[in-house]
Amino acid sequence: MMEPTIHLRQAKVGDIPAILEIEQECFQEDSFSREQFVYLICRSKGTFYVVVEQERMIAYVSLLFHAGTRYLRIYSIAVHPDCRGRKLGQLLMERTIETALECKAAKITRSEEH
C-alpha cells in the first residue's frame, strides 16, 4: 500500500473551513474566528501555510512580519490531534525558518495568544 502524500502550500480563502476545524479541535474556546483567518490569509503582512494529505487539511502555520522590525512572528501553529506524532510540526517549523531566511528576518518570535 502506498504512503499518503503530504503537500505543504500557501493557504487560500477556500481553506478556511478546514482551518477552522483544526483550530477548534486544538484550541476550543480560545480559537480564532473565521474573520481573523480571512484577514491572516488575505490582508495581513505575512504568509499562511497549510499541510494537506489526500485533500484533507491536517496542519497549518500563520506567520506575520512584525511592523517596524525584521522579526517574523509565528502567530498560530496547529496540527490536527489525529495527525500528531508524524513530524508535521517539524515540517511547518522548517518552512518557517526557510521563510525567515527568504525575507532576511533577524529573528523568529512567537505569539503569546495560543
Language model region names:
Residues 113-114:
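Conserved small/polar residues in nucleotide/adenosyl-binding loops
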Residues 106:
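Short acidic/polar active-site loop segments enriched in Thr and Asp
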Residues 6-8:
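Extreme N-terminal starter segment of soluble prokaryotic enzymes
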